[in-house]
Structures are given as C-alpha cells and as structure tokens.
Amino acid sequence: MEQYTTNPEEFYKSLKKNLDLNHDFPGNYLYKFILTNHDEEKLGELYQVFDDLEYSLTTKESSNGKYLSVTISCFVLDSNHVIKIYKDVSKIEGIIML
C-alpha cells in the first residue's frame, strides 16, 4: 500500500479502497498499536476508543520494557468504521499505528 505522509485524507482514501476490495464486512478487523513509553494514561485512552465495541485484546511488552504492543480484534461494520477508529486513535499522542 502506498504511504501518504503529507496528506492523511489521501492515505485514508487509499485504505478504504483496499479494505473494500480485500476485507469482508461486517466482521472482525485486527488493529495493532505500539505505545512508545508504556504510559498507562495512553493505554486507557486507547481502551476508551473501543469502549462501546465488541473486541478482544492482547498486549506484549518489549524485551527491554520500553514499548508495549497492543493487538485488538474488533467487530466492525464496514471500511468507514475501520477508518473512524484509526482516526480516533490517531488523536492519542505517542501511539504508533501499524
């Protein structure tokens, strides 16, 4: 997939197209995030994005303890729902979205 660092809307447009072509909706979608400093406040903010959704979550701390990997499998309705969640998470400073 192409990366758009200067224009997020172009990135999301491309992501939507790829999701519509390659993913069956409604269904589960796998999100992966990395917290850069294992900040409990940021982790709480991430959980709040998924509060009203059906999801399962796993976490794994890096070997040096500096990072926390968070994997969330979430039931989504369509590609717009996937993108809305990504946009909500993007507002949390210090979280890397994979």
Across the structure, where does each feature detected by a protein language model lie?
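Long, contiguous binding/interaction regions
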Residues: 1-69, 75-98
